Amino acid sequence: MLNLRQTEKEFLLPHLMRGGVAVDFTMGNGNDTLWLSEQVGQTGRVYAFDIQPEAVARTAERMKAEAPFENYTLICDSHHRAADYVKAPICVGIFNLGFLPGGDKGITTLRETTLPAVQTALTLLAPKGALLVAVYPGHEEGRLEGELLQELFSSLPQKQYSVACLRIVNAPDCPFFYLIEKNK
């Protein structure tokens, strides 16, 4: 079976650099926040967003216990307000849409904030930077987010962005990924 998580990291690694700025737009339990922190190193910076205080608290505990560097800022706010906090161009951004693993499945990312958040991420992205957007179509809002993002990514100018979609086509409810690289 394809290991989509491994493919995700293989895509992002060439774009991550020591001293770079990275954003985890959907903090959750802090898995991506921790990984990004390790990759950008002591002189880099990671910003992580979540609207749920529970997610921020879990991630804070995890980072305190496991992060090798104090190079992160955890923000309890919507990812669509990222530009209020992140001022430098970013080398990598990650979105894991859906709901907090182990949390209330009634609280999910929403099209109304996901679309402006992704648009903000695209403007923050440095040349040769990369975004990864994981979509979970197994619930209605996830399916609708995926459709909206397909429209957005299909409309991006090819000279400025390269966009791929990694999907297991015979498993329609399986998570899939958009991989975006800024060309210029």
Regions found by a protein language model. Name each.
Residues M1-G20, L34, E38, V56-P89:
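S-adenosyl-L-methionine
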Residues I94-A117:
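Mobile active-site "lid"/loop adjacent to the S-adenosyl-L-methionine
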